[in-house]
Structure formats: C-alpha cells, structure tokens
Amino acid sequence: MENKRWEGPRRGFLPVYSDSTHWFDCASFLCYWEGDPFYETDKSWFESTYIHSGISGYEQTISGPDAAKLLSELVMNDVYKWRSGTCKHLVFLNEEGLIDDHVLYMKDSDDQYRTTAGVFFYPQVNAASGKYDVNITQKKTFVFQFSGPRSLTVIEKVTQTDLHDLKFLEFRPVQIPGFDGSFEVCRIGMSGTLAYEIRGEEAWGADVYNAYLVAGAEYGIKRLGWRDYTVNHTFGGFPQQTVHWEMALFEDPEFMKVARTAMHCTGSVDPANRRARHRTPVEVNWEWMAKFNHDFKGRAALEKEMQNPTRKLVTLEFNQEDIIDVYASQFTDHPYKFMDMPCAEPQQCGGHQDVVLKDGVEIGWSSVPTYSSHYHVMISHCTMDIHGAEIGDEVIVKWGDFGGVQKDLRAIVRPSSYVRYKNDVQDNRNYDLSTVPNGNR
C-alpha cells in the first residue's frame, strides 16, 4: 500500500474537509474543535479507534552534556534511571510544591531529550542562565493520537510495519510508504486503554492525517476534536492541567510577562481562592513518581506534604436526575448554569472548581463535570480531604458560579480511574496484543 498526498486545502497540520467547519486555536495552532460528533467519537476508543491532532505544535529538543542535569534540577522524577528510546512523564514544581507544568519527554540518548507538549518555560530560562552546557532547539511537529482496539492495526496498515513488539512508553522511527519524511510512533495515551502517537514534520501533517483517515475507514475510525479531547483524560484517570486544574506558573510574574492568557476562574469556589485552582502531585495521586535521590525545585515542600498528606484524588459520579434537572431548568425563567456537552465548561477549563460538601462541610474541589456516551454518565475529578469521604459515599457538588444561582448535585465517590473501576477495557500497560489484528498483512 502506497499512501497518497492530500491534494485539498490545508490549515497548518491538518487537511480541510468539506465538514471541517469548527476550529480551535490551541496555543496558536489550529485544530478541529469537533471532527465527528462527540457522542460517536467518545465511543471509538472502546469499539474501534480515533485520530486526534490537538497537541500538535512545537517540539523542543534539549541536547548537550548537561541536558540531564538541567532537567533533573527542575523535575521531581529521576531522569538518570531512564532507558533511551522510552518516554517519561516529568513533573515540574514551584517552591511551594505546586505543579508548574507536567510534560511527556522522550529520551533519545543520555545527552538528548525531546518534548512535544507543555510550555517549555523553565528549561529555556535555566538554559539561558549560562550554567549548563546545553543547546535548545524547536521545530514544528505534528502529533496525531490514536486509541482503541484497532489503533495499532490502522498504524501498521499505513506504515506497513509490524509494531506488535512495541512496548508501553517505547518509541521508534518508522517510514510511511509514499511519504519522504521522518516519522516516529510511540505507545502512549490517556484513555486508559491501547493508545499510540504518530509524530513527524509539520509539512507532512495533512498528508499523514488523511492517510490514516482513509486507512481507518474500514475500522470505523473517528476524528476526535478539542471539544471532546478531555473525555478520555477524565474517564481514563489521567489528571491534566488546563482541564482539571491550572498550572501554578500562572502565579509566576516572570511567566506572566510572556503568557498568552491569564487564568480564568469559574465555578462555585470563590475566584479569589487561586490555591483551589492548582494542585500538588499528592493531590492528583502522583506522589509515586517523586524520587528524592536528587535536589529539585519544590523538593522540601513535597517531602513535607508526603510525610503528612491531607488530600487525595477521587472520581465523582453525578446523580443523573440532578443533571437532567439542570437541563430542564433551561426551559424555565430560572435556569441553573448551563452544562455544555461533553465537557460542562468548554476548554480551557482548569480554572473551574466547584465546592464539594459532605454533611454540610466543605471537603474538596471538583473539576468540570464530563459526560461519556459510552458509559452514559457524567463524572468529575475531585481533590478531596483524605478523610473527607469514602468510596461509595454520597457528596454534594455546588454547580454554578460563585455568588450566582447554584444547584446541589448529588454524586457518589468512585475510585480513580473510572475505566479501571468499570474494568471493561484492557490497560495499555499490559494490553493483550494477540487480540489485535496485524495491519501489515
């Protein structure tokens, strides 16, 4: 199979189809707001696969003898015990132990690391200090994400390569017949099940995207847009800045001098409470990633918190009658705050936090309610007092903006993640690939 170049119009990394009518400006790069209807797409990673372009943008490469040293002094992870050809989720903190940024990095070698996400702020600032023998470069790169039981099959069909031996977190270069570019595939994703990324040079983006859409048609591939990108993070149990909370970088005056936007605070939590819009690693159940065998920014605060943790991450499953009542109220003279679909507050919504009560006492903060057309439920991530409530307890979430009309939403405390709680899909980390048809045949 030789893939054909896209001959139609294009915008940045993407082809423009006749139904490509809604676009989203994601950090100055355009992506689809909604490719296929969200209620179809949100079933795709359980039934077939999707393709998503939303994190395409700049790829930053840090290279040189001090590349690992620079990263090590900024992140809570151990960057020295890390095999080349694999990726790792690095977490940057401020001195108070709040998450400044969290980013997936690829390790090419002991002196070269790459990322295609995040804001790149502190690596650039520290590199410019002259204290490190490093070089930082950037280029425009497409990143197309796939997830679902046929994601690997479609990728193999386009690359004409057997990738069944690619393990979780590994990446490797691949060729795409008909396209004279440099590409790589990585086994990673946030839906909680089988998932991959394809990356390559910006110029090939529209061609590669269309090739996968054509190849995946027989498997029912769907185009996921930014409107429903947050669904797999929420149900997959992967907390995400700009979705479930906001970066603590918004409290850094130097960052705000170059930031493209300010933090937008909505929800029933007082907007003056900026702390409720940020998280520590402990508050999103990421403390297991921290390694205290090196000095890093925020270490003292994180160590102190881990000795006496006060909050945890859980899932809240909302009472369906209460959600229906919110929508029914829109047809009266006294409506509650509207809930969009599938994300009740459209992206970017990390600054949205709602008060959570148990027996009338505030016990936590709930992020934006999010709907799944697969499970037919609406859930949210909740950072809750560690003894605030137990799994199975009922709590109240105050839906509505601070000072405005609010609706009490009943919710049941569920574990994080929801897909692991439901246990109806295989985990990407140990997915049985013998059940996946080989697309290179």
Per-segment meaning from a language model:
Residues 1-33, 38-43, 106-111, 116-441:
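Conserved, structured C-terminal
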Residues 34-50, 74, 78-79:
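Active-site-flanking structural segment that lines cofactor/substrate pockets
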Residues 48-53, 190-191:
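Short acidic (Asp/Glu) and glycine-rich catalytic loops that position anionic groups and cofactors
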Residues 53, 95-98, 347-348:
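A short catalytic or substrate-binding loop motif that flags glycine-/basic-rich loops and adjacent residues
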Residues 54-55, 139:
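N-terminal non-catalytic cap/leader segment that marks the start of a structured domain
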Residues 55-66:
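Low-complexity, highly charged intrinsically disordered N-terminal segments
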Residues 65-102, 150-182:
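Internal amphipathic helical hairpin motif
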